Each structure stands twice: as C-alpha cells, then as structure tokens.
Amino acid sequence: YVGRRMRKKDILVSLFIDPDADQVEAAKRVRAGSIELNTGPYSEASSIDAKNQHLVQLRKAAMQAHDLGLRVFAGHGLTTDNVPAIIHNVPWIEELNIGHHIVSRSIYIGMEQSVKDMINCIQV
C-alpha cells in the first residue's frame, strides 16, 4: 500500500533487503522499483567457502529481482578486496554503494587515489 502511494507521487521506492527469495518477492509485491542487496554477511565472512555461499545467495537474489523487473543495487561492507568477486559473479547489479571504504582509505592515501583504486576494482 505504501509503495503504491509513493509511486503515485513519483517517489522512487528502493528497499534494502537480505539476498533472500521471499524478501525479493515482497519487494515486488510492495511495488518497489529497486532493491539494494545486503552484502554485509558476504563482506564479513571469514572463510572462502562462506564467502562463496554468500556470493551464490547474492547471485540468485539478483537474478530473481532482475527477472521480476526490479533494478538491483548492492552494498554494505564492500572494499577493494571483495568487490571484484561481486562484479564477476553477480552481473545484474547496476550500482554498488561503497562510500565508507573509500572515505576511510582516503585518510591514508588521499581521496583521489582511493576513488581510482575502487574504479580499478570495478573495471577488472
């Protein structure tokens, strides 16, 4: 109901959700135009196996959302170390939200270099 009312007023609706099929379906039901997949568990995973399991979940959720006509974004805890795997494994993502890592690194290497490094990771 809220999503429908907001869209009638030309307000774009995007929901931050876990990469879960039920949550993707719910986003479509409330007429969100886009979702942002929570990459926090992927970013915090300590083993390669756990990271790979989270990548599979992200991939499935992104594909499902794309197939339902939702735009797909992702973010939370993304860094220059973990972004390349997202780029290579989850092609339906249109936008990554990475601000904290870029700003934090800029303290040590400068904003320009921090941004360049992230761009290089994304363009791999």
Question: What is each residue range found by the language model?
Answer:
Residues 57, 63-71, 78, 82:
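Active-site-adjacent C-terminal substructures of enzyme catalytic domains
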Residues 35-46, 91-111:
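Glycine-rich phosphate-binding active-site loops on the catalytic face of alpha/beta enzymes
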Residues 47, 51, 105-124:
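C-terminal helical cap(s) of enzyme catalytic domains, especially alpha/beta-barrels
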Residues 20-30, 74, 78-93:
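Catalytic cores of alpha/beta
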Residues 16, 54, 75-76, 107:
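Glycine- and other small-residue-rich loops at beta-strand/loop junctions that grip anionic moieties
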Residues 10-14, 33-36, 69-73, 77, ...:
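Structural preference for beta-strand elements that scaffold enzyme active sites
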Residues 2, 11-64:
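Histidine/lysine/aspartate-rich catalytic loop segments that bind and position anionic ligands
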Residues 5, 26, 64, 85-86, ...:
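Well-formed, non-transmembrane alpha-helical positions, independent of function
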